[in-house]
Amino acid sequence: MAATTPPVSRKQSRGMSIGQREALTGYLFISPYLISASIFTVGLLIYAFYISLTDLRETFSRNFNFIGLQNYITALTNRDFQISLVNVIWYALIVCSLQTVGALALALMLNAKLPGMRIFRTLFYAPSVASSVVISLIFLWLYIRTGFINYFLGLIGLPNETAWLQTPTGLFEVIGQQFNPEFRISNQFLRGPSVAWMAIMAMNIFTTIPTLMLLFLAALQDIPEYIYEAAQIDGATGWKAFWTMTLPMLRPTVVLVLILGTIGTLQVFDQVAIMTAGGPVKTTLTPAYLIYTKTLGSETSAQAGLAAAMAFILAAIIVLITWMQRRFIEQSSERL
Amino acid sequence: MAIAQERPTTTVQGRRDPRLPSRALGLAVRYTLMSLLAVIFFAPFVLSFLGTFKSNQEITAWPPAILPSEWRWENWARAWNVQIGGVEGNVFSKWLFNSIWLGVVNMVTQVFFSAMVGYGFARIRFPGKELLFTFILATMALPGFVTLIPGYAFYARLGWIDTYLPLLLPSLVVPFGILVMTQFFKSLPVELEEAAYIDGASRFTTFVRVALPLSRPALITLAILQFQSSWNNFIGPLLYLRSPELMTLTVGLNYFKSQFRTEWTSILVGSMFNAIPILIIFFIFNKYYMSSGSTAGLAGQ
């Protein structure tokens, strides 16, 4: 485009109307996205779906057949996939709820108009800029039997002998063993999340709270002052003001934090890949990690077609759950 | 949008509270609690930073001591000079360099193209705009994992495995960036651009000369977030980079850990190579980070 041409003659060029000319400019501006999205979003999705309908095993292989929806049936009846889904649902439930409550509590504490709040905000947020790799490596060390986690637990008088990331005992077994040391649950699906898995959950909650705190803080600061003053006149202070005024106004942020949390936790991968590789006895196996091993496995263990089908099932579950969260919270707001 | 208005941090509310002593006590409790929390949030980093100076026996000894018995600065030098098979020279410096240039290239391209596409959506009328924008929002709700791993098969067929192409090309322009920039340009007054436009500047010139300089705060916020996401990216390089020579620091660290499981001090020093630069960036650009809360909030609406 010639920058110096007067607008009138430019608009009349090539026999296009002003509107057509404008539209062409628009498409040129968004062309990077159009090109990128058609290859790497739409193209990849179609390709991924096509792969999921084949019996492709080793990724580089050119030897595969079309087998329809067989992979989807195989995936749903695959024991490892079922275990990984149960694991990740525990993970999402516990991590999402605790990190949302924790982030909100932290934001409320920081929202006060007191000196030093900016410094605390900065200090709280800083650790969350570190990568999941660094966090995982650091906690891998903190969680060893002779590590600092056990050391601090010992200082406050708690049991300090646990090898956190090697313990497959389920939560319900741990509770039962408080009463009967021999307590075991034979069904793998009913044991609850393992000690190793809960250790990773705790780490994840700890590192995500500051990021989500920032979202709540931004929303809290958007609530106009007069609303609190009005509430105060009505006699609503403290907890009552929080439940009747603040929380309803934060509803969109709560939805956002829950949805972001759900999408993130259901795809959890980095921590598992670095810390446990799915062990002990598959109690930290997640769908994302399973899909990864099935895609990149050796020639005998790779099942790329099946892995693609699992990825679509996981995506469908995530979309379904986030949609339900949105609906549920919107409906509950209508009832109020 | 972008930059959250910094509220004046007025000291304690003007009104006098009759229950002054209990208020002072409340404040003391609040500050103590927050200081304690700050210590807890920082503890893992401080403990592992101190751990980098311990010997390999001391670092797994029971009971663990917070301070090293002797400050072994040579641990850092040793980690820096670590060599592994298949890589010429020092691995950590190589991985660090790869992470830096990938982060910078990703940041520059993403910021420029996000701004360009965002400008198109915010300012120019063309058929299908609403539909396309809805499509962008929909792809943001799509879990990244769906295309990530089957993408591996796709790039394998293209011969892109063990090159940087899968880490650069698909992320030239990302939905999050487009969304942020579109909302930002919509919040800018259009008059300045109209003046330039009437003066005969083309749309593109107006975008580069007028709109871009005005959007500095949004561009900086976006740039930091994109650099950080590239710097911290793990699964991408893990999938697409095979040879240790090409790895970034994140996957390099994981590779190093799998090779030298008991070399805790070197693992922790390597972690510091990754964590310290991003922490420095955070403290320098702190105010842009704090505004990212409202940016991300906006992305979710």
Q: Whereabouts are the PLM-identified features?
A:
Chain B
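Short, Lys/Arg-rich, polar N-terminal cytosolic tail immediately upstream
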Residues: 1-22
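A structural signal for multi-pass alpha-helical bundles of membrane permease subunits
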Residues: 6-7, 18, 27-301
